[in-house]
Amino acid sequence: MPEIRVTPLGAGQDVGRSCILVSIAGKNVMLDCGMHMGFSDDRRFPDFSYNTRSGRLTDFLDCVIISHFHLDHCGALPYFSEMVGYDGPIYMTQPTQAICPILLEDYRKIAVDKKGEANFFTSQMIKDCMKKVVAVHLHQTVQVDDELEIKAYYAGHVLGAAMFQIKVGSESVVYTGDYNMTPDRHLGAAWIDKCRPSLLITESTYATTIRDSKRCRERDFLKKVHETVERGGKVLIPVFALGRAQELCILLETFWERMDLKAPIYFSTGLTEKANHYYKLFIPWTNQKIRKTFVQRNMFEFKHIKAFDRAFADSPGPMVVFATPGMLHAGQSLQIFRKWAGNEKNMVIMPGYCVQGTVGHKILSGQRKLEMEGRQVLEVKMQVEYMSFSAHADAKGIMQLVGQAEPENVLLVHGEAKKMEFLKQKIEQEFRVNCYMPANGETVTLPTSPSIPVGISLGLLKREMAQGLLPDAKKPRLLHGTLIMKDSNFRLVSSEQALKELGLAEHQLRFTCRVHLHDTRKEQEMAMRVYSHLKSVLKDHCVQHLPDGSVTVESILVQAAAHSEDPGTKVLLVSWTYQDEELGSYLTSLLKKGLPQAS
C-alpha cells in the first residue's frame, strides 16, 4: 500500500534548523534547510547523513523547497549543496531568492571573518548554491517531474514567505513553514484554499499562546520606549534585517511624528537601504494599504530613523537602536548589548522568539550574569522586556489554518514538546484527525488511500487515438475529461457527453479587460482600424470583422465603445474564455500599446 513518510532532521520538538524529509508516493522532498542559532559546533546543521544512506544524494532527493529567508530555515543550504553534495533543484519564491544570499553572507562574515570558525561555507559556495534555485510564483503549479508538482501559497510572516503544497497523483502534503494568520502594518495574512491534503505539516512555535490585542501590545511598546528615553536611557531592539524591523520602524516613525520627539532612532547601517530596495521591488507581497499608498508615499522611507554608526553606542543621552541579529547571538546587537547592559536606565526589548542557547533566550529566562567569550562575566542591570511582535501564528491562528485546509492528518514541527502536546490534543479533539509530533530522526508513516479504478468512455479514448499518440506503458499520459460517479463507480467522459447524460446546459466563463485609447474617430471606424491592425499582426490566427462592428480572434471578442466622460477617448472591451487566456493577455498588451497611425 502506498504511504507518506515524514522524518524531521531538524525542528522536530525543537525550534531551529528546520529541515523535514518527506517521502510521498516514491518521491523524496526536503522541506527547508536551516541552521540552529544556539550552536556553533556540529549541532548547528541538521543531520544530513539520513539522506545519504541510500547512496548519491541527488539521486535520492527529487527537490529541496525553502519556505522563507530566515536562517533557521535556509542557513544550511550552501553547506548542504556545496559541501554535502546536493546538485538537484531548489525551489523558493523570488523575494526569498533575492534576500537569502545577503543574509547568508552576513552570517558567514560573523562566523568566519570575526569568530574564525572552520568547516563553514564560503562566499563562492553561496553564489554556486543560488545558481541551483528555481523561483516560484504564488499559486503557480510547478511540475518538478512527470508526477511531482508543487504550489506556493502566501504565508505572511516575512516578505516572500510561502506555504507549499507537494502533490503526487491524488496524495498531497502541505508544509506551512512559518506563517501569520493576522495581517500587520506591512504584510497580509496567510491564506490557503480548502485543498484537503493527506497531511498538513504546520509550525507550532506559539502552540499554547493566544495573543492579546495587537493595539494594546503596540501601546505598551510605545509607552516603554517613551518612558526610557524621557529618563535619559537608551533602548536596544534586537531584530532580524527584514520583517519585525519594518513593522516596529513604521510604528515608532508614526509615534515620533505625532509626539514631536527629538531622541534619535537608529537602524543597523546598510540594512534600511537594503530593506527599502526589496520592499520596493516586491511591493505585491506587502499588504493592501502599502500597495495602495506606495505611489504617493513610500512607507519605508523614514524621516526619523537614521543609519547607525558604531561610535554612536558610546554617545551620551537617550536613543533608540534597532540592531541585528534578533536573538543577541552575534553581530551588532550583541556588541551594543554588552556596552549598555550595565546601566539600569537602559532597556532591551526582545520583540520575537529566541532559541535556546542564545543570549536573548538566557536574559528572557531571567539570567542576569552571563558568561561571554573568554570566560568574561557580564552583569545585566538594564531592564529586559519581552513583547511578542513575532510574526508566527498563535494557537488560534494554527487552529484556523487547520480548519481552512481540512487535512486528513496533521503533523507539528518547529515548537517545544510540552506545548506541542497540548496543541496536538486540541487538534485531535476539535477536528477528529490524527495529529503527530515526531522528534528529530523519528519517522512517522501514514498509509494513504489506494488508487480508485476509473472507467474511460470509448468516445474519449477514440478522440485520444485520433490524435495519433500511441500508448506508452513507461510514460503515463493525461486524459482530460469530466469525472462522473454513479452507483459508487467512476467514469471519465468527454464534457459534451457529461452535459448530455446529466441534462445540463453548458455555461461559459469569459474574462473582460478594458483598454483606453485616445481616438476621436467614431466607434465603427475605430473597430475597422483594430481589425486591420490585428489582421496584419496575427497572421496565424483567424481574425474576423463581424457585421455588428465587433472583431473576433479565435474565441476572443473585441468591441469598441465611447468613453462615458471623455469624448476624445475610446474604450476597447477585450473578452476571452480561459482556453484562450494566453492569447487574450497577449492581445490586451498589444492593444494597450496603441494602434498604428493611419497612412
Swiss-Prot record:
Subcellular location: Nucleus; Cytoplasm
EC number(s) from the headed UniProt entry: 3.1.27.-
Major localisation: nucleus
InterPro entries attached to this UniProt entry: Beta_Casp (IPR022712), INTS11-like_MBL-fold (IPR041897), IntS11_C (IPR048662), MBL (IPR050698), Metallo-B-lactamas (IPR001279), RibonucZ/Hydroxyglut_hydro (IPR036866), RMMBL (IPR011108)
Chain positions recorded as Zn(2+) 2 binding sites: D72, H73, D178, H414
Regulation: The RNA endonuclease activity is inhibited by BRAT1 that forms hyrogen bond and hydrophobic interactions with the active site.
Residues binding Zn(2+) 1, per UniProt: H68, H70, H157, D178
GO biological process: RNA polymerase II transcription initiation surveillance; snRNA 3'-end processing; snRNA processing
Keyword set, alphabetical order: Cytoplasm, Hydrolase, Isopeptide bond, Metal-binding, Nucleus, Ubl conjugation, Zinc
Gene3D superfamilies: 3.40.50.10890, Ribonuclease Z/Hydroxyacylglutathione hydrolase-like
Cofactor(s) of this protein: Zn(2+)
Post-translational modifications: Sumoylated; sumoylation regulates its subcellular location and is required for integrator complex integrity.
Keyword Secreted: no
Keyword Zinc: yes
Span of the annotated motif HXHXDH motif: 68-73
Molecular function in Gene Ontology: RNA endonuclease activity
Motif (Nuclear localization signal): 469-479
Record cross-link Glycyl lysine isopeptide (Lys-Gly) (interchain with G-Cter in SUMO), residues: K381, K462, K475
Pfam families referenced in this protein's UniProt entry, alphabetically: Beta-Casp, IntS11_C, Lactamase_B_6, RMMBL
Active site: residue positions: E203
One GO term describing the cellular component: nucleus
Family label: Belongs to the metallo-beta-lactamase superfamily. RNA-metabolizing metallo-beta-lactamase-like family. INTS11 subfamily.
Assembly with partners or alone: Component of the Integrator complex, composed of core subunits INTS1, INTS2, INTS3, INTS4, INTS5, INTS6, INTS7, INTS8, INTS9/RC74, INTS10, INTS11/CPSF3L, INTS12, INTS13, INTS14 and INTS15. The core complex associates with protein phosphatase 2A subunits PPP2CA and PPP2R1A, to form the Integrator-PP2A (INTAC) complex. INTS11 is part of the RNA endonuclease subcomplex, composed of INTS4, INTS9, INTS11 and inositol hexakisphosphate (InsP6). Interacts with WDR73; interaction is required for the assembly of the RNA endonuclease subcomplex in the cytoplasm.
Free-text function comment from the UniProt entry: RNA endonuclease component of the integrator complex, a multiprotein complex that terminates RNA polymerase II (Pol II) transcription in the promoter-proximal region of genes.
Protein name: Integrator complex subunit 11
Source organism per UniProt: Bos taurus
